[in-house]
């Protein structure tokens, strides 16, 4: 008879969790930041608010965003005008849209990741799904499992309303699942659609206006597993360690409240300072065991909460400008997609490394860090180890 210890050892993988494939997807509808103020004030019937529109246009200009992809169209707003009002009861119709579209967009990213991975979907043992939108039972994880035709025995984890730090949360969760279940292959999906947060402008809610200028829709999927079979799987990044912390006395710094009017967004002006003053402590705790204290020796995947946050972190840590290039590129091309952002940046990082003929998937560097920042104020820190590039 096997002992409990023997059973536990047999259940565990030998090596670290590894990202084996990445897929991303966006809605078709694209909005350009240069004329978004005109579009936004027109579709919300707010063109009479001329001074506020000028202020919003300045916010858009400073956002460092070129374009975003958004599921919500002008035709949908014409059909459901309460969504475009500032504070009108609209949760029911928002839910009707989101509970269908969030899993559908997640499916698009998941299929791309599965195709890159190249293995039968029957080998997916676990599913981790994350979204800030559309709470229901059974959840988006159940819907996605059915849309993809996964095994009925797939072990599911559903994460709702985590917010912008959750790209780190899903990787931390997938790491624990992969390393504690030998042979596990974890499909991780983040799918975000801003139908739940879209609303018209108000003079009394400038933080809401900031959100309207920043957020975009997108989904990203990764497949995570330990002990990859390199004859049929292509490792991209190892997940070496993962930690979460929250900054004391900052519960309201980034917040969302689900109400009859949808999900309202609240933001303190000092969020960039709060994050930049606490990020080095997270780095030190994560990299001390590795003897690393030069933050410019790392490749960087940082959630792009907005340009002010990136600028503050860059200045506080004396980072070279090129360190946040991949992060700024994703912000520019897609906006802030909440939990999906860091997975988009991982994808950009490995593609950029391949195109630039770098030695590793981390722009030629061995070690990297992935940061998620969000409500709480919560910081997720994931230590990454890159993989030598395959040239064929």
Swiss-Prot record:
Recorded GO CC terms: cytoplasm
Induction behaviour: By stress.
Keywords annotated in UniProt: Acyltransferase, Cytoplasm, Plant defense, Stress response, Transferase
Gene Ontology BP term (one): defense response
Subunit structure: Homodimer.
Catalytic activity: 4-coumaroyl-CoA + 3 malonyl-CoA + 3 H(+) = trans-resveratrol + 4 CO2 + 4 CoA
Organism annotation: Vitis vinifera (Grape)
Enzyme nomenclature, EC number: 2.3.1.95
Protein name as it appears in the record: Stilbene synthase 3
CDD domains: CHS_like
């Amino acid at each position: 008879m096997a002992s409990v210890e023997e059973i536990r050892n047999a259940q565990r993988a030998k090596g670290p969790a590894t990202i084996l494939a990445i897929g991303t997807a966006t809605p078709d509808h694209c909005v350009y930041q240069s004329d978004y103020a005109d579009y936004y004030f027109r579709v919300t019937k707010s063109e009479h608010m001329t001074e506020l529109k000028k202020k919003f246009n300045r916010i858009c200009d400073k956002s460092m965003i070129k374009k975003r992809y958004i599921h919500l169209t002008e035709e949908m707003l014409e059909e459901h005008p309460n969504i475009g009002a500032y504070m009108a009861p609209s949760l029911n119709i928002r839910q009707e849209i989101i509970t269908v579209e969030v899993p559908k967009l997640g499916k698009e990213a998941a299929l791309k990741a599965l195709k890159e991975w190249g293995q039968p979907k029957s080998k997916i043992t676990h599913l981790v799904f994350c979204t800030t939108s559309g709470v229901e039972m059974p959840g988006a994880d159940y819907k996605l499992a059915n849309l993809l035709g996964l095994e009925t025995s797939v072990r599911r984890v559903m994460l709702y309303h985590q917010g912008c730090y959750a790209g780190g949360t899903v990787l931390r969760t997938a790491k624990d699942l992969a390393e504690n279940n030998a042979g596990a292959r974890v499909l991780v999906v983040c799918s975000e659609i801003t139908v739940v947060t879209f609303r018209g402008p108000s003079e009394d809610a400038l933080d809401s206006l900031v959100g309207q200028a920043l957020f975009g829709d997108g989904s990203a999927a990764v497949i995570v597993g330990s002990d990859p079979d390199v004859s049929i799987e292509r490792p991209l990044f190892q997940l070496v360690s993962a930690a979460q912390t929250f900054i004391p006395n900052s519960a309201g710094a980034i917040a969302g409240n689900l109400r009859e009017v949808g999900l309202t967004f609240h933001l303190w002006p000092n969020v960039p300072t709060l994050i930049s003053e606490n990020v080095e402590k997270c780095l030190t705790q994560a990299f001390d065991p590795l003897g690393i204290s030069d933050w410019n020796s790392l490749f960087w995947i940082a959630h792009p909460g907005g340009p002010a946050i990136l600028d503050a972190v860059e200045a506080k840590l004396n980072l070279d400008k090129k360190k946040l290039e991949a992060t700024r590129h994703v912000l520019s091309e897609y906006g802030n997609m909440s939990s999906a952002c860091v997975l988009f940046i991982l994808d950009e990082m490995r593609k950029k490394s391949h195109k630039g003929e770098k030695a590793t998937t981390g722009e030629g560097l061995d070690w990297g860090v992935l940061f998620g920042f969000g409500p709480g104020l919560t910081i997720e820190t994931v230590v990454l180890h890159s993989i030598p590039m395959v040239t064929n």
